[in-house]
Amino acid sequence: MRPRLYLRVGDRVVHLRYHYWGEGVVIEERHSSLEGGFCLVKVLFEDGEERSFINDLDHECCCYYSGVRIVY
């Protein structure tokens, strides 16, 4: 089964619980070639830190469920 992805490279995001991180930009997507493997995104936030998140909406730890939201 293919993963349902939430974020794409270039998306601007914020985190609902960590507003002091500032706005972030998705700079990298990684997809596992193994069945059931992780789909990850790397986000560069305004505080200068890169943070990685699970990007599969079918996974209970998806970045959407942990508070990452797209800025439109």
Regions picked out by a protein language model, each given a short descriptive name:
Residues 22, 36-42:
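Short aromatic-glycine-enriched beta-strand elements
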Residues 1-12:
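Mixed-charge, Lys/Arg-rich low-complexity intrinsically disordered regions
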Residues 6, 34-36:
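Short solvent-exposed loop/turn micro-motifs enriched in small/polar/acidic residues
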Residues 31-32, 48:
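Short active-site-proximal "capping" loops at secondary-structure junctions
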Residues 47-72:
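Intrinsically disordered, low-complexity, charged/polar segments
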Residues 12-14, 42:
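Residue-level detector of beta-strand face positions
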Residues 21-31:
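Short beta-strand-centered aromatic/proline hotspots
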